[in-house]
Amino acid sequence: MGSGGVIHCRCAKCFCYPTKRRIKRRPRNLTILSLPEDVLFHILKWLSVGDILAVRAVHSHLKYLVDNHASVWASASFQELWPSPQNLKLFERAAEKGNFEAAVKLGIAYLYNEGLSVSDEACAEVNGLKASRFFSMAERLNTGSDPFIWLFIRPPWSVSGSCCKAVVHDSLRAECQLQRSHKASILHCLGRVLNLFEDEEKRKQAHNLFEESAHQGCLASSYLLWESDRKVDMSDPGRCLHSFRKLRDYAAKGCWEAQLALAKACAGGSQLGLEGKACSESVCQLFQASQAVNKQQIFSVQKGLSDTMRYILIDWLVEVATMKDFTSLCLHLTVECVDRYLRRRLVPRYKLQLLGIACMVICTRFISKEILTIREAVWLTDNTYKYEDLVRVMGEIISALEGKIRIPTVVDYKEVLLTLVPVAPRTQHLCSFLCELTLLHTSLSVYAPARLASAALLLARLMHGHTQPWTTQLWDLTGFSYSDLTPCVLSLHKKCFHDDAPKDYRQVSLTAVKQRFEDKCYEEISQEEVLSYAELCSALGVKQESPEPPSFPSSGEIHTFLSSPSGRRSKRKRENSLQEDRGSFVTTPTAELSNQEETLLGSLLDWSLDCCSGYEGDQESEGEKEGDVTAPSGLLDVTVVYLNPEEHCCQESSDEEVWPEDKSHPTPGTQAPPASAPWPLPCNRGDPGKDVTTSGYSSVSSSSPISSLDGGMVGSPRSTSVLSVGSHSSTKPCYHQAKKSCLQCRPPNPPESGAHQQPVKRQNLSVHSDEDTNLGFLKL
C-alpha cells in the first residue's frame, strides 16, 4: 500500500523490478596443470631426461612433481646420451631412483673409463668400485631376463697391472658377503665368470656360488647345476627320474634352456617312465607356444632403411661369423638383437654396421666360450668406428633390450627336431642351410620360428626325395600338419632359391650364407642341385602358381653398403657406380696398394690396431696384443656417390689386377719396419670447438694414427672411398654439402712384367665421429 492509501499493483506500469546485471562468465582456462597428478606422471614418465628438465623449469608444481617422485626418474629415457662430467649427477640420480638404462650406462662407462675421465693413477681400482656399484643396481632392476652383467667382466682378464674387470668381480663378491638380500642374480654372475677359467679351484668356487644362488631362487643357476650333474644322474635310473622331474619344474617356471632340454629329453621318454603320447604333448606345447614377430615393422620405424640394406648387413655378419667360426645359434641371436633394436630405436644408416658388430660382440660373450673382442670388432670394421663408439652402442643395446639377450630362435626348434627324429647328415645340413637363409628375409618373419624350422625340415626332406617327408610322428611332435606347413614351404623355397639375391654396387651377388655352407664340414650342401618350383609344387600336391617377381630393387637402386670381410671367398670387382645421398653413409675403404704404399702403411696397420684396442683386459690372449688378429680383406662400404664416370676419382680396380712385385709384403697383424720417408698428412678441417678428448686405460689411444703425427689436428673425420692406385692426380674429388675433402694422389710405378702381388686391404686411418661429418683422404 502506497502513500495516501493508494494500492499499487505489481504490474509493469506500477512497479518495476531493478534490472539484473548479467555477469559474463569467463571461460575456464585448462592447461596441463589442470590434469590429475596420475595423468601428469604418465606424461612425464616416458620423456627424455632433457625434456624432463625443460618441463621442470615451466612451473613450480611441475618442479615439485619432478623433484619428489621417483617414478619420473625411474622411467626417464637416456637414449643417445652418455655419462659425462656435465650430466653425471643426472645419471646417478636416475640410477638411484631405479632407472635401468642409467645404471647400465654408468657401469659400462666406469668399466671402460669411457666418457668419465679419471686420472691414470689408481684408475682401475677407482673405476672398478664405481662400476660394481652400478652393475649391482642394474642387476637388481633386471627382473624380466637372465642375469647378464657377467658378460662385461668375463675373462680374459689383463695380466699386466691392475684389471678393472677383476676389481669389479672382487667388489661384487664382497658385496654379496655383506648383503643378505637381492644377491641371487649377483651370485649367478660371479659363478658364470669363475666357471670360464681353466683353474679347477675356481670352477669349484663357481659351483658353490651356483648352489647358493639357486638356494636363493635363481632359476638360471638351478638349470646350470642340473646340467652339470646330468651325466652323473643318468647313470642311475632313480636319480635320472628325479633329475627329469627337476628339469620339468624348471621348464614350467619359464627357463627357456630347460624347456629345450626337456623337449630333447623326450627322445628317451621310455627311460624316464613317460608314454609316447605324453612326450609328444610336451614337445607340441613348446612348438605351439612359438609366436611370430613381424619384422616388417622395422621399416615403419627406420624410414631410411630398406629390406635390401638389411639384407646386405646380415650378409656381412654371416661372413664375419664364418670367418670367426661362430655357431649358427650365435649368428641367429645376433640378427635377432639387431632386429629388436631396429624396431625400438631409430638408427642412422651410417651406424648400421656398428650396431651389427656390437650385437655380435654381446652375443658371443653371452653364449660362446670364444668371444669377439671389442678391439677386433673395431678392426673388422676397418676402423670406421672408434673403440669408444662400440663401447657406447653396447650400452645402448643392453638398455634398449632391457638386458634380454637370449630369446627363442629358429635354430633352437631345428635342434629339437633333429634330436627327436632320425635324419640323414646331408638332410640335417640342408635343413641348417635353409634355417640360416631365413635370416636374410624379413617377409618370412610372418611365420613363427617353430613353423619356419618345421618347414625347413619338410623342404629338406622333399628335396632329398623322402617318400614320407612329413610323418605322423612329426605331426604329433610339432602340432603342424602337412597342409599347415605348405604355404610356409612355398614361401621359403621362393625366397631362398627362386628370387635372385640382391647385388651390391659392384654387381656382385651377396651369397655369404651359400659360401658358408660350401665348407666340407657341411658336405658342401649349398652346391647341391635345388628342386625347381614346379617340382616342389608337384611334390606338395598343390597347383603351381607363378611366383611373384623378385622384390629386390634393380642394381641402379642399390646403394653402396657392404663388402666382404673375407676376401678369399669371392673376387668382387669395383666399378664406377652412380649413386646419390653421400652424406648418409660411412665408408670402409677396400683397395689394393702399390709397393710404395705398402712400405708406408705396413707398420701403421698394426699400430692402428693396437691404438684402437681400448681396454687391455678385453682381448682373447696375450698373443693378440702383439697383432695376432684375424685381418679382414674387405669390409663395410656404405658410401653413396653419384657422379659422372669421367669425373669420378675412383677408377676400376679388382683382385685380378697386376701389381709390382714386393718381397717384403706386410700383412695386417704383423709388425713391419717404419717407413723411412716422412708420412704424408691428410687434409682435415676439424671443428676446433668440438671436444674430441676420450678417456680410457693406458692401452687406449684417443687419437688416430694420423692425428698422432700432426698435433694440430682435431676432430674425427668420417672416411670416404679410397682411390684406386692409378687415378689421375688432376681429377677433382667429389664434394657434398657441409663436407670438405682434399685429395692428392700420384700414379704408381709401372708394374714389372709378369709380376703379381697379393692384394692388401687399405687401412682406414680416420676414425668416425657423430658430431664431425668432415671427410678426409690420404695424400699419397
UniProtKB/Swiss-Prot annotation:
Extent of motif D box 3: 349-352
Organism (species): Rattus norvegicus
Keywords assigned by UniProt, alphabetized: Cell cycle, Cell division, Cyclin, Cytoplasm, Cytoskeleton, Mitosis, Nucleus, Phosphoprotein, Ubl conjugation, Ubl conjugation pathway
Family the UniProt entry places it in: Belongs to the cyclin family. Cyclin AB subfamily.
Alphabetized CDD domains for the sequence: CYCLIN_CCNF_rpt1, F-box_FBXO1
Domain F-box: 29-76
Pfam families from the UniProt entry: Cyclin_C (PF02984), Cyclin_N (PF00134), F-box-like (PF12937)
Motif position, D box 2: 343-346
Motif Nuclear localization signal 1 mapped to chain: 20-28
Motif (Nuclear localization signal 2): 568-574
Region (PEST): 582-761
Major subcellular location class: nucleus
Protein purpose: Substrate recognition component of a SCF (SKP1-CUL1-F-box protein) E3 ubiquitin-protein ligase complex which mediates the ubiquitination and subsequent proteasomal degradation of target proteins. The SCF(CCNF) E3 ubiquitin-protein ligase complex is an integral component of the ubiquitin proteasome system (UPS) and links proteasome degradation to the cell cycle. Mediates the substrate recognition and the proteasomal degradation of various target proteins involved in the regulation of cell cycle progression and in the maintenance of genome stability.
Ranges of compositional bias, category Polar residues: 585-594
Coiled-coil intervals, chain numbering: none
Name by which UniProt lists this protein: Cyclin-F
Disordered, as annotated region: 544-594, 651-733, 745-780
Comp. bias regions, Low complexity: 695-708, 719-731
Comment, domains: The nuclear localization signals mediate the localization to the nucleus and are required for CCNB1 localization to the nucleus.
One CC-aspect GO term: centriole
Residue numbers covered by motif D box 4: 762-765
Molecular function GO labels: anaphase-promoting complex binding; cyclin-dependent protein serine/threonine kinase regulator activity; protein kinase binding
Keyword Hydrolase: no
